[in-house]
Amino acid sequence: MLSRSQDKTMTKPISPLLPIAYSKEVASAKQRGAPLVALESTIITHGMPYPGNIEMARSVEAIIREQGAVPATIAVIHGTLHIGLEAAELEQLAKATEVMKVSRADLAFAIAERRTGATTVAATMIAAARAGIRVFATGGIGGVHRGAEESFDISADLEELARTGVIVVCAGAKAILDIPKTLEVLETRGVPVVTYESEEFPAFWSRSSGIRSPLSLNSPAAIANFQTVREQLGIDGGMLVANPVPEADEIASEEMEIYIERALDSAERDEVTGKAVTPYLLSTIFDLTDGQSLKTNIALVENNARLAAEIAVALGE
């Protein structure tokens, strides 16, 4: 059970009914005008097992600090929206077993019912924007699931990218998804998709999906400038920055496709649906790859955190 930490700086609620708490580090950064990078918490609670999840979370936060920015891991704890977690809270969240996975549809529910919830990409974007944080680092976004023409399973992440003005740095859409359809939805919704230092859109564990990226840029400063001009033009919505996993850590896309197909077949046999699909597939792929998928996942998250911090610093220059 997560304890109620007293080591927090309570701030004026975003609205009269919404309790929000900034960690001391984040509150200090906001006061100084220091660059901030938002981090989701679902990757901690639903993405990998303990203690690997807490080690990854600490490493990612340290990487952001090394680049001159401040990490802000976002979660709902006992109905309070936390922007930044103290060390003890991060540890407790990593060990917790009964944590909601909250998106746009149920973020308010978790707060209203005083639940504890880990934020998805969509929920983290909402919280980051409310807190004035312009950059967010994650592993991979959700998107259009394979077979969506029958299941209609499409992640709320795509709609959030069209609505909320946050730069999301990721390693592309998760490769378990239908990447071409995911990119089509993003194009339809007017979301700019920029691949960093590559002409090809990445596929999470693999550096290339075989699909040409809509846009590409080669420096954090160029990405920051692009977003600044969008804001000056009054263009709503976020930007997706796809950062290919380091070459030394990737799993070839041809090899990954074999594992993904096996995992999808298993999910169909077990009749897995809804929010349970992605965690199930990731867990199955972990087993099929003898843990290599998790090692690659950690490497790409760390790589994304580094780029996100560089972009956040560039936005402040």
UniProtKB/Swiss-Prot annotation:
Positions of Mn(2+) binding: 153
Enzyme superclass (EC): lyase
Cofactor(s), by name: Mn(2+)
Alphabetized Pfam families for the sequence: Indigoidine_A
Any one GO MF annotation of this record: pseudouridylate synthase activity
UniProt-listed Enzyme Commission number(s): 4.2.1.70
Residues binding substrate: 101, 121, 155-157
InterPro entries according to UniProt: Indigdn_synthA-like, PsuG
Cofactor binding notes: Binds 1 Mn(2+) ion per subunit.
GO cellular component terms attached to this protein's record: cytoplasm
Protein origin, superkingdom: Bacteria
Keywords, sorted A to Z: Glycosidase, Hydrolase, Lyase, Manganese, Metal-binding
Active site: 40, 174
GO biological process terms, semicolon-separated: nucleobase catabolic process
Coiled coil stretches, renumbered: none
Reaction catalysis annotation: D-ribose 5-phosphate + uracil = psi-UMP + H2O
HAMAP family: PsiMP_glycosidase
Main function: Catalyzes the reversible cleavage of pseudouridine 5'-phosphate (PsiMP) to ribose 5-phosphate and uracil. Functions biologically in the cleavage direction, as part of a pseudouridine degradation pathway.
Family: Belongs to the pseudouridine-5'-phosphate glycosidase family.
Complex and partners: Homotrimer.
Protein name: Pseudouridine-5'-phosphate glycosidase 1
Native species: Rhizobium johnstonii (strain DSM 114642 / LMG 32736 / 3841)
Originating gene: psuG1
